[in-house]
């Protein structure tokens, strides 16, 4: 799905997504990633929600977000609370949704100038 909104805010804009990829700044990514308006971390370790561990959010914490959008893959799966403990302990708001919805939400929130980070799981095996 194409996203038309280019807010001009930040350096990293999600332009499109489908079940197996996300396009940011005209580059197609096919693996999990962390993206914020000013930092992109491709090749984020978890390949599925089952792979996700609390310590995977260490790099998210270093970005000091007010909101983290967790894209759980092709389908929304509610993540167990223990996987989110690092964020919960720092009182960082977490919104979990399927990765497509996370891409749309990221685009909407950066247009508002919010300090957000999207942690997107892209699982090409299911």
Tell me what each language-model feature is.
Residues 1-52, 58, 63, 111-126:
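Non-catalytic interface/targeting segments
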Residues 99-104:
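Short acidic loop-to-helix transition motifs that present clustered carboxylates
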Residues 42-43, 76-79, 105:
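Short active-site-adjacent helix-start/loop capping segments
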Residues 95-98, 118:
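General beta-strand structural signal in soluble alpha/beta enzymes
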Residues 60-96:
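Mid-chain, well-packed structural core segment of small domains
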Residues 105-111:
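Conserved phosphate-binding catalytic cores of ATP/NTP-utilizing and phosphoryl-transfer enzymes
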